[in-house]
Every structure is written in structure tokens, then in C-alpha cells.
């Protein structure tokens, strides 16, 4: 049995939560964890699955009405649906990774009072990398399940989500002003409950940084796949790249040391 198969066996049944700001790479790390057999769970995925599989329930009807009106589904609807989704046989047997949920302390209190996690993986990225990375990286997303892609990490089939087959669209809200507001909201609403998770003793930090030896010339960006962060320097804007394969290997090494 090779190292990857051993890690898949170790990770079977594990319950993880990816914690980090917008643009930190949760989507790519979710893909890496799905490759280990974990089920990817986000609020949009759980809501659409509930509406599809149980359309006549009161929860489904309420969620569908709110979503069709363009509103935000309230916590008292979202959390029970996500918790129910986590009880599905595939999640119980294979384990799961929560991506981008919960977003608020209220959601976290409701969810984690019922769900025990093995690990909260905090993806810690410098804020300036986030702002320039998101704006400069031309991020894409699935219109159905919100799975993230970019020019440098595209779906296997152009325009089609690897996960659910939904349509891939450009994220029109990826501009500096909007990203700054989203990061402020993350700091105020989401990062604020990180100490509560740390008190449970299940948080591990995976710092994401860019070293000088990973700097590349902008002319090569179109031919290489990776996560691009634009950082203001005295010399102007430089393009720096985190190699996706390197980050995947780093994550797998971390999980092997943590659980093996």
C-alpha cells in the first residue's frame, strides 16, 4: 500500500472543518481532501441536496422560497439542513470536510453543540496576499454549489463544475473594495469565534506564505497552474505563485503526521 492509500485509510471517517478568510484557498484544499475520500459539505450543497431529495418538507419549502427570492436562508433553516446532511450515510462512513460553514458564531454554536469534529484546519494567509490574490487571480465559481476555480486552477471540463456539473461563472464581486469589505466581515463575524474552537483543542494552523524562491515572471502565469497573489513592493506589483501540487503535498504530510 503506497503512502496515499495509507493516508486515505487513516482519514476515513474523519470530520474536518476548513477555517479561513475569503480567497485563502479553501476550495483547493477541499479538492485535496475530497481526493482522500472525504465528502465536501458546504451550506449551498446541503441546501440544494435537501430541496432535490426532500422537496415537500417544510425546511425544503422555506429554503427554496428564500433562495428563489434572492435572500439569505436564516440560521434556523440552514443549520438543521447542514446537520441532517452530515448524518447521511456517505458522510458518516467516509467522513467530511466543512467548507466555509459555519460563518457566524450563532451558526457555530448551533452546529458544534451537535457535531464533534476531529480537526479544524485554520488556513492562515496574510491579508495583503488575499486582496491582491483575489483581485488578480480572476476567480471562478460554480453557480450551483459555489465550488471555487480560477484561470490557474480550472475545472477539468471548461465551464463545467468537477463536483456537481453546474455552470462555472466569473465572480463579478472580486474587486478590491468588495474584497476588503468581505475580509472585514470575516474578521468581525467568523474569525471572532475562532477562540471558541481553539478552546476545544481541535484547531491546527496551516500557514500559507510565499517565499522569495517561489517568485515567477508574469509572462509565465498563463502557462502555469497555481494560486497567484499580487503583492505591492517598492518595485511595483509582482506576481507570486503557490504551487498547487506543493500545497497538496504539504497538506497530506501534515495530515499524516497528525493522524497516522
Regions flagged by a language model, labelled:
Residues 1-260:
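Glycine-rich phosphate-binding loop of ATP-dependent small-molecule kinases
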Amino acid at each position: 500500500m503506497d503512502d496515499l492509500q495509507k493516508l486515505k485509510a487513516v482519514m476515513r471517517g474523519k470530520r474536518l472543518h476548513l477555517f479561513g478568510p475569503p480567497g485563502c484557498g479553501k476550495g483547493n484544499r477541499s479538492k485535496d481532501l475530497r481526493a482522500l475520500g472525504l465528502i465536501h459539505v458546504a451550506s449551498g450543497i446541503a441546501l440544494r441536496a435537501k430541496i432535490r431529495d426532500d422537496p415537500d418538507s417544510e425546511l425544503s419549502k422555506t429554503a427554496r422560497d428564500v433562495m428563489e427570492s434572492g435572500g439569505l436562508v436564516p440560521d434556523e433553516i440552514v443549520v438543521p439542513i447542514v446537520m441532517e446532511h452530515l448524518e447521511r450515510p456517505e458522510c458518516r462512513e467516509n467522513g467530511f470536510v466543512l467548507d466555509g460553514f459555519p460563518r457566524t458564531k450563532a451558526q457555530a454554536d448551533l452546529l458544534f453543540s451537535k457535531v464533534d469534529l476531529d480537526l479544524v484546519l485554520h488556513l492562515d494567509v496574510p491579508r495583503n496576499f488575499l486582496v491582491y490574490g483575489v483581485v488578480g487571480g480572476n476567480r471562478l465559481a460554480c453557480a450551483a454549489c459555489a465550488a471555487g476555480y480560477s484561470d490557474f486552477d480550472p475545472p477539468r471540463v471548461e465551464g463545467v463544475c468537477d463536483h456537481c456539473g453546474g455552470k462555472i461563472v466569473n465572480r463579478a464581486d472580486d474587486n478590491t473594495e468588495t474584497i476588503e469589505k468581505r475580509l472585514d466581515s470575516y474578521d468581525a463575524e467568523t474569525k471572532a469565534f475562532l477562540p471558541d474552537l481553539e478552546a476545544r483543542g481541535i484547531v491546527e494552523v496551516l500557514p500559507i506564505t510565499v517565499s522569495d524562491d517561489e517568485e515567477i515572471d508574469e509572462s509565465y502565469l498563463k502557462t502555469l497552474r497555481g494560486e497567484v497573489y499580487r503583492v505591492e513592493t517598492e518595485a511595483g506589483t509582482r506576481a507570486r505563485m503557490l504551487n498547487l501540487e506543493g500545497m497538496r503535498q504539504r497538506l497530506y504530510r501534515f495530515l499524516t503526521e497528525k493522524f497516522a
